[in-house]
Amino acid sequence: MAEEKQHHRLFHHKNREEEGGPVDHKKKVKHHSHLQKIGELGAVAAGAYALHEKHKAKKDPENAHKHKIKQEIAAVAAVGAGGFAFHEHHQKKEAKKEKKAAEKGRHH
């Protein structure tokens, strides 16, 4: 009987936005700005690694195919990270609009 009553609270966490409480718009803007920077850094790092592998493919003709595959994977990762940064940029702009609308409604 005790085993049946035992509940794990794995999926019972509430999201702050779902609670209906006040949303901290400044924190939301900062969060999306931070994620945008991470996306940009990821794109730069993956692009640098792709260039590194391109150089390795030229210098090591014996394993050139392996290096070209790694280069292509890094290039795809760079494009994905750039897309993520672009997405977060738009999320940040949306959060700024929400912040401005909330401030406008507050300061009659």
Swiss-Prot record:
Record family assignment: Belongs to the abscisic acid and water stress-induced protein family.
Q: Which InterPro entries match?
A: ABA_WDS
| Residue spans of biased composition, Basic and acidic residues class | 15-24, 95-108
Which cysteines form disulfides? none
Q: What is the lineage of its organism?
A: Eukaryota, Viridiplantae, Streptophyta, Embryophyta, Tracheophyta
PANTHER family for this protein? ABSCISIC STRESS-RIPENING PROTEIN 3, ABSCISIC STRESS-RIPENING PROTEIN 5
Basic residues composition bias: residue spans = 25-34
Q: Where is this region: Disordered?
A: 1-34, 84-108
Protein name per the record? Abscisic stress-ripening protein 3
| Taxonomic source organism | Solanum lycopersicum (Tomato)
Q: Which Pfam families match?
A: ABA_WDS
